[in-house]
Amino acid sequence: MAEQTEKPEWWDQAKKELSEADPVMAQIIRANPEGFLATRGNPFETLLRSVIGQQISVKAAANIWERFAKACKEIKPEIITRKHRRTLRTAGLSERKIEYVFDICRFFLENPDAADGFQHRSNEEVIKELCTIKGVGPWTAEMFLIFALRRPDVAPMLDYGFIKAVGQAYFPEIAFEEWSAADRKEEMSSVIAKWGPWRSLNNGPMQY
């Protein structure tokens, strides 16, 4: 898959329909007229970035990735698997994340056609297969669907940034820290129901 720097073919239709269905989204779309969901075009790299970025800040993840990429020279599974663990630890990876990185490498080495194959499979099928890899759970699989495959209908309900952004946009009167899990689930579900098949549009400019 080549890097896709042009907006998805469904993007303009999604913006139009969301603007008509949801006044809050209409305002967000007007405020961000040029943005769109981009992808690096490299599913292997996207999955690695998602795992390396788990449970740390965006800034910390970017710094670790920069050191990791420099240590590996090329982001290819056959190259990364030959690196000594000490090299990856020096780049900032924990022992657990090193295990995850190696397991992702093994998956792509054993399934060389996986990247193209994912394009023709349902969201549920992709999530199920990705979750067989160590370190890949539902959150990481959903990030992959959004940022690698650019699927339009993914609402990452486990993503802190997504939840907080929805809260700030739709429920500004509620302090995020006081938003109970039960209320959050109910209120977010009512918001997301308005988005129809375009739930990925609200995932902001971040790129994995």
What is the predicted role of each segment?
Residues M1-P43, K194:
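Intrinsically disordered, low-complexity, charged terminal extensions of DNA damage-control enzymes
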Residues Q13, E17, N63-E66, K70, ...:
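Intrinsically disordered, compositionally biased low-complexity regions
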